[in-house]
UniProtKB/Swiss-Prot annotation:
It catalyses: aldehydo-D-ribose 5-phosphate = D-ribulose 5-phosphate. Homodimer. This is Ribose-5-phosphate isomerase A. Substrate binds at residues 28-31, 81-84, 94-97, 121.
Amino acid sequence: MTQDEMKKAAGWAALKYVERDSIVGVGTGSTVNHFIDALATMKADIEGAVSSSEASTQKMKALGIPVYDLNSVDRLSVYVDGADEINDRMDMIKGGGAALTREKIVAAVAEKFICIVDNTKQVDILGEFPLPVEVIPMARSYVARQLVKLGGDPVYREGVVTDNGNVILDVYNLKILNPKELESQINEIVGVVTNGLFAKRGADVLLVGTPDGVKTFTAE
C-alpha cells in the first residue's frame, strides 16, 4: 500500500463520524483532500461544511458541497483534519500548508476533532517536523529573535502569504517535550498570530492509515 493509499484509507474512514444534517468542519492538506472526495458522496445528507482554507473551500465548491462562513454557524459536531506530526497523547504539529490559524479556530469550535494521517506522521516526540509560526509581517525579525531564545532555529518561508495576509516562520531543531507549555510561550510573543502546536486542543480521535488498514485511537 502506497503512502497516498494509506492517506486515502484514513480520509474515507473519517466519513463514519459525520452526522446527518450537520455542518462539518474540514481542514487542509493531501489527506483531507481524500476526505473531501468521500464527503462529496454524502453531500445530500449534510447541510454543508466550514473550511479552514481557501484551497479546501474551492475543492468542496467544485464538488457541490455548500461551504459556510464560520461566523454564521452555531455548532460543528466534528472537525476533520490531518497533521504533520502527532504523538501518543494526541498533541500535533500542523501548518505545513500554512493554514494553521484558521485550522486552530475551526478546531476550537468543533465538539470533536478527528485527525486523519498515514503512519509516517506518528512520532514519540514532536519537533522533527519544523514548527510553523504565523507572524504579522512587521514583527517577523523580532519574533525570530525570540524564537531563537526558546532554542529554535527559525527560517522565513519565502514566497508564502497566509490566507490572513501574514507570513510563516518555520522553527527547526525544537525537541518539544512539553507541547502545551511551548504552545503558550510562543503565542505570548508579540506579533505571533498563532503557532502550529495543537496541544491545548488536541485530537479526540486519530485514524491512521497503515499497510494493514486503518487503525483507530481515542484520547484518554
